[in-house]
């Protein structure tokens, strides 16, 4: 089964996540098929978290049967809400 999920990177207590397409049998930080975005939760006190998602690729993979994790679903909702406010 193909899933859209997060891969944790970064230093201790300074996480940085890649949003990837991966087979569910692979480990969390293991091999993945495609990188479709990133999420930086801790930039600094003055800056909000940064989210970048390629929505075209997400829709492509969902149409082909990929399943999003709970956290990725929340990030996609936040990303679409931010884009609507900017436009």
From Swiss-Prot:
The record's listing under InterPro entries reads:
Ribosomal_bS16, Ribosomal_bS16_dom_sf
List the record's Gene Ontology CC terms alphabetically.
Answer: cytoplasm; small ribosomal subunit
Give the UniProt keywords, A-Z. Ribonucleoprotein, Ribosomal protein
| Keyword Metal-binding belongs to the record | no
Q: Which Gene3D superfamilies match?
A: 3.30.1320.10
What GO molecular function annotation could you give as one example from this UniProt entry?
structural constituent of ribosome
The record's Gene Ontology biological-process terms are: translation
Q: Which HAMAP family match?
A: Ribosomal_bS16 (MF_00385)
Its family remark reads: Belongs to the bacterial ribosomal protein bS16 family.
Query: What is the protein name for this chain?
Result: Small ribosomal subunit protein bS16
What is the organism field in this record? Buchnera aphidicola subsp. Baizongia pistaciae (strain Bp)
Primary gene name: rpsP
